[in-house]
């Protein structure tokens, strides 16, 4: 397997070879106060690891990207299409394209794994 062209952090397009990385080798970004984000980007999909401080709120929003979310650690109060759901470590959620959703982290640090297709261009540098 190869890391492909460009840098070694998985952030780049044009990969046609398989890649194998570890989260510990992927740079951490800080898109907002209380949020850490790591991204591993492919040609048509991406996976992001988010770490949220307790009680942080992500406002309700929608986007054209299909999204799968895995709760790796903690508990989250999700608001999905006007309904409230509590998700805990081990739970998996699916958000179809243009699904209205948001979340409030509960009383502990939360780690979420989000998979998006197509790529979230708004997350990419440049």
Identify the residue ranges that each predicted region occupies.
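A short, N-terminal "cap"/entry segment at the start of jelly-roll beta-barrel domains
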Residues: 1-44, 125
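Short strand-coil-strand connectors
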Residues: 43, 79-83, 106
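Conserved short histidine dyad/triad with adjacent acidic residue
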Residues: 46-62
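Histidine-centered catalytic micro-motifs
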Residues: 59-66, 99
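Glycine- and acidic-residue-biased ligand/ion/polar-headgroup-sensing regions
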Residues: 65-76, 81
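Short acidic-glycine-tyrosine-enriched beta hairpin
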Residues: 82-97
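Ligand-binding loop in jelly-roll beta-barrel domains
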Residues: 97-122
